[in-house]
């Protein structure tokens, strides 16, 4: 039982002890990888840098990443966060970019057919402490 758990949407801006955290699944990375030479599924933090530069979580979309037309674009990054966390690629990375820690969470899931098709090997069960 998790009495203190709060469920949020995707993306989410949450404040933890005064620290502004941007949490995003990372689906937008799928459209960035084929279009940017330095961005790979093994180095998703490069996509995160582009997202921060462009101030949008899906600066390229339409090929693999469909976006719902809404009155307000929920993918816009109005202000840079103190911490930016994403996943989706099942990679693992921690890197600082312009004073912002970029955290790519690992996975507990095994290799999927999609990953096999891409020739990508996930980095499983990596925890930071």
For each predicted feature, which ranges?
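Extended recognition/assembly regions associated with phosphoester-bond processing machinery
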Residues: 1-129
């Amino acid at each position: 039982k998790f009495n203190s758990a709060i469920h949020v949407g995707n993306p989410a801006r949450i404040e933890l002890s005064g620290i502004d955290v941007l949490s995003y699944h990372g689906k937008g990375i799928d459209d960035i990888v084929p279009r940017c030479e330095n961005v790979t599924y093994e180095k998703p933090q490069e996509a995160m840098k582009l997202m921060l530069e462009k101030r949008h979580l899906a600066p390229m979309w339409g090929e693999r990443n469909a976006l719902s037309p809404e009155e307000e674009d929920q993918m816009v990054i109005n202000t840079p966060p103190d911490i930016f966390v994403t996943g989706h690629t099942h990679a693992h990375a921690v890197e600082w970019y312009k004073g912002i820690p970029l955290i790519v969470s690992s996975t507990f899931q095994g290799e999927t057919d999609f990953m096999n098709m891409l020739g990508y090997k996930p980095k499983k069960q990596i925890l930071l402490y």
